[in-house]
Regions:
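Surface beta-strand/loop "capping" patches
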Residues: 347-390, 415-418, 483-487, 529
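Primarily recognizes the serine-hydrolase "nucleophile elbow" in alpha/beta-hydrolase
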Residues: 115, 219-278
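The feature captures the conserved acid-bearing segment of alpha/beta-hydrolase catalytic domains
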Residues: 265, 269-317
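Short beta-strand element of the alpha/beta-hydrolase
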Residues: 92-95, 102-112, 132
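Extracellular ligand-binding interfaces
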Residues: 493, 506-587, 592-610, 616-631
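Cap/lid segment of the alpha/beta-hydrolase catalytic domain
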Residues: 123-126, 131-214, 271-274
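N-terminal cap/lid segment of alpha/beta-hydrolase-fold proteins
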Residues: 51-101
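Catalytic histidine neighborhood in serine/cysteine hydrolases
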Residues: 317-334
Length: 632
């Protein structure tokens, strides 16, 4: 096969080059990217790649650590990114594959901002029959016996090889594509700087760190296709947050990608005020190049990959094979039934061992004098549940995204019933003067459970998976013109804890009973002036618990004995880490019930962390009558 011949050539080349003198080696370091012929920089994403061949240079693999775990071969290593301004750049990462594996699909995993390349990704992937590399574009690595934190990254920059904590990691050479922190103190992701540590002497997309990190990822694809255990025709890419955007940029610049899954990124970088950024390293130019199957993981309240940009992104891609998975209420995190969709996507398109159901189709009907009516057309194979979520807190004013609102908006839930071979439900709205955003989730049962490493490498076990419809957005003008009715009135009862109440609450740790909601931010449950917050709780044993409002918390002692205990709270009962309180309930957006929570001081503060509540004893508590009480 041609890739095996290339690999053999690289090995021979490396052996020969090892005998060359240092001067001759230096002469071989021809820059990876051609110099600009004029002072004009590339003006498009495609033009930025002119003259770059990701397979042209040796890969120069350096194995820094190797071990076996659960019949999986794992290696911390570095490969050559390229030569820039005469200096070699090297990408560190963690590579893993099942021992004795052959003709395996290969995965490139890209971490997010502030995160690490982590061995748990290739380890869990290998157990499912994949070879994969978790690349460390920012320099941080997490592996047994080889951890590179920001401290070790700084030691590497400073060349302090005598320090016992020193470790080799990603080396950007003459350039700087590091992040959190960057080596030169200036983040070159949102900007296009010109400096002695950038490639071009004029504003150029090749100076931007998105471009450089994407180049490093493309070289990662070359690394994968040269490994003897990998089928080079079956390569996939996935990543979270900044890694989600980099996944889109990589798939949008390299045809070797046969499937891609961005989570919480790759759809909302479309509002930068710099025209050169928009034309090159923003999301749309890459999205318009994507022809491979793509699955977007986009939680409803994510600040980085916003759900209202998802439909636009779908319209931009060239691929007809796409799905979306949108968890309600979540921001930049997910639970197992949403995270597992990435594994199923690769199983279908790289292994041919799974078939993903079709995308749920949603339609919102507006009729005079009636509530908005939702109808669905779904793939009914192995359906576990069907849910519709909607909000009237979506932003459609054309202004800059209100990040606080995006992360906090409340999504109402309604169950869906089948009548006359059609799935349908009505929506109770509180105003025709506010926009209406609606989407549906269909959850399917898995034949057997799947275990994997999540967005932040926490291990999850999924018994089911969820696919979403595209969100439908309806303007206030459309609601008024249709003369639909707004039937939802202000309500003092926040939660009755009956039926499907948990659908309007959420948790990122389902192994514990703690739960949270944004209901108090919705106008329907706005607190009257001078109201108290009241609920009743039943605990099996004496315990402590917390009630949290954003970063403000109060502690409650419970008597236990399986008897109902009333709790009445004033807004002044909730304190932040500085022991300060707010004057009004309207200042808060999220309500939490949990057993224990630690308040952390701001960075640089001398205030000690404060723990409230205590680890729970006995069965999970029961709740009822969560409401606002108006003093008589």
């Amino acid at each position: 096969m041609i890739f095996r011949k290339i690999s053999l050539f690289f090995v021979v080349f490396s052996l020969v080059s090892s005998f060359l003198s240092a001067d001759k080696k230096q002469n071989l370091l021809v820059d990876t990217l051609p110099k600009l012929k004029t002072s004009k920089a590339p003006q498009s994403w495609n033009d930025a790649w002119n003259g770059f061949d990701p397979r042209a240079e040796p890969i120069d693999i350096e194995v820094l650590k190797e071990w076996e775990e659960d019949n999986v071969v794992l290696k911390v290593l570095r490969y050559r990114i390229g030569i820039f301004k005469g200096q070699k750049a090297m990408m560190a990462g963690v590579y893993g594959y099942p021992k004795e594996g052959k003709n395996l699909p290969g995965l490139l995993q890209i971490h997010g901002g502030g995160q690490y390349a982590d061995y748990k990704a290739p380890l869990s992937n290998a157990k499912r029959g994949y070879a994969s590399i978790s690349i460390s574009w920012a320099g941080r690595i997490s592996a047994p016996g080889y951890r590179v934190s920001p401290l070790e990254v700084k030691l590497f920059w400073e060349g302090k090889t005598n320090d016992p904590r020193y470790k080799l990691t990603t080396d950007w050479g003459a350039l700087d594509a590091y992040h959190a922190p960057s080596r030169n103190g200036k983040d070159a992701f949102p900007s296009i700087p010109v400096a002695d540590w950038t490639l071009d002497s004029v504003p150029s997309p090749r100076n931007n760190s998105w471009f450089l990190a994407t180049l490093g990822a493309r070289r990662g694809l070359t690394f994968l296709e040269l490994q003897p255990e990998i089928d080079p025709d079956k390569l996939g890419v996935y990543g979270h947050s900044m890694g989600g955007k980099l996944s889109v940029l990589t798939a949008g610049s390299d045809k070797r990608v046969k499937a891609v899954v961005p989570s919480c990124g790759g759809i909302s970088d479309r509002y930068n005020t710099n025209p050169l950024h928009l034309a090159t390293v923003s999301d749309p130019p890459s999205l318009r190049n994507i022809r491979c199957p793509i699955l977007f993981q986009s939680p409803s309240n994510d600040f980085h990959g916003r759900i209202n940009d998802l439909k636009t992104s779908i319209n931009e891609i060239k691929s007809k094979d796409w799905r979306v998975a949108c968890s309600p209420h979540h921001n930049h995190q997910d639970s197992a039934e949403y995270e597992v969709a990435s594994q199923l996507w690769f199983d279908q398109y790289l292994k041919g061992s799974f078939k993903i159901p079709s995308t749920p189709q949603i339609n919102v009907n507006l009729s005079k004098g009636k509530k908005p009516m939702v109808t669905l057309n779904i793939d009914e194979s192995k359906v576990d549940s069907i849910d519709v979520f909607y909000t009237q807190q979506g932003q459609m004013d054309g202004k800059k995204d209100d990040s606080t609102n995006t992360k906090s908006r409340f999504w109402h839930h309604v169950p869906v019933l089948k009548s006359n071979d059609a799935w349908a439900t009505e929506l109770s709205i509180h105003s025709v003067g506010k926009p209406l955003w609606v989407y549906a989730n269909v959850t399917y049962k898995l034949g057997k459970s799947i275990t994997g490493a999540g967005y932040y490498y926490g291990m999850y076990k999924a018994e089911k998976f969820t696919l979403s419809s595209l969100m439908q957005t309806i303007t206030p003008r459309a609601l008024k013109e249709a003369k639909v009715v707004a039937t939802m009135k202000p309500n003092l009862v926040i939660e009755d804890f009956k039926d499907d109440w948990k659908k309007e609450w959420f948790s990122y740790n389902k192994s514990k009973w703690g739960i949270r909601t944004h209901k108090i931010y919705d106008p329907v449950w706005a607190a009257p002036q001078k109201a108290n917050l009241y609920f009743e709780v039943k605990a099996e044993m004496p315990n402590k618990m917390i009630v949290g409002l954003d970063s403000y918390v109060t502690e409650i002692s419970l008597t236990g004995n399986n008897s109902w205990q009333g709790v009445k709270l004033r807004v002044s009962d909730f304190k932040n880490i500085e022991m300060k309180s707010k004057n009004a309930w309207s200042a808060f957006r999220q309500l939490r019930l949990n057993d224990v929570e630690q308040q952390r001081p701001p960075k640089g503060s001398r205030i000690a962390p404060r723990t409230l509540g205590a680890p729970w004893k006995g069965r999970a508590p029961e709740f009822r009558y969560l409401r606002w009480l108006i003093p008589s």
